[in-house]
């Protein structure tokens, strides 16, 4: 709740417990408003109308409710949540760093750009990554029918 949601709102992946999670920005119950970008990031994650509903009514959502409106990206049973969070971190760590960083730059700014600008950014990303050692490893792994091991 509150600051405990504002930090995850700045993250690309947000996991929640299936049971017992309490997710929301209840600051209006305290006579104040969300800080640290909570309202702006919430509106970008779930849309303006959902953000207005959640903030002005100081609603608290469960994990599954938050998943239903796109506030979290995954929901897991409490006993499995940490395992899946670690699994996600390991999965991302195994990805090609340059390609991940380049694609994030494209995606994070895409809402602020025209389609033509986003397509240009994607084309530039292809050119920036295609000759990388990771791209060579990915292609070799594909041809050899094995899992790639990126540097």
Give residue spans per PLM region.
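Crotonase-fold acyl-CoA enzyme core
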Residues: 1-98, 132, 136-137, 146
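Amphipathic alpha-helical segments that line or abut small-molecule/effector binding pockets
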Residues: 52-53, 120, 124
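Short, charged, surface-exposed hinge/linker loops at domain edges
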Residues: 104-113
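Short C-terminal tail/terminal secondary-structure segment
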Residues: 111, 147-151
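Short beta-strand->loop
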Residues: 113-119
């Amino acid at each position: 709740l509150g600051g405990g949601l504002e930090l995850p709102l700045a993250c690309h992946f947000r996991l929640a417990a299936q049971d017992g999670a309490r997710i929301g920005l209840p600051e209006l119950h305290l006579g104040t408003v969300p800080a640290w970008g909570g309202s702006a990031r919430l509106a970008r994650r779930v849309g303006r109308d959902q953000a207005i509903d959640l903030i002005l009514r100081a609603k608290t959502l469960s994990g599954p409710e938050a998943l239903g409106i796109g506030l979290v990206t995954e929901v897991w049973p409490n006993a499995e949540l940490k395992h899946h969070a670690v699994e996600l971190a390991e999965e991302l760590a195994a990805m090609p760093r340059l390609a991940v960083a380049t694609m994030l730059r494209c995606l994070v700014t895409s809402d602020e750009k025209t389609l033509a600008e986003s397509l240009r950014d994607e084309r530039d990303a292809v050119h920036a990554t295609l000759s990388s050692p990771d791209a060579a490893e990915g292609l070799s792994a594909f041809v050899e029918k094995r899992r790639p091991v990126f540097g």
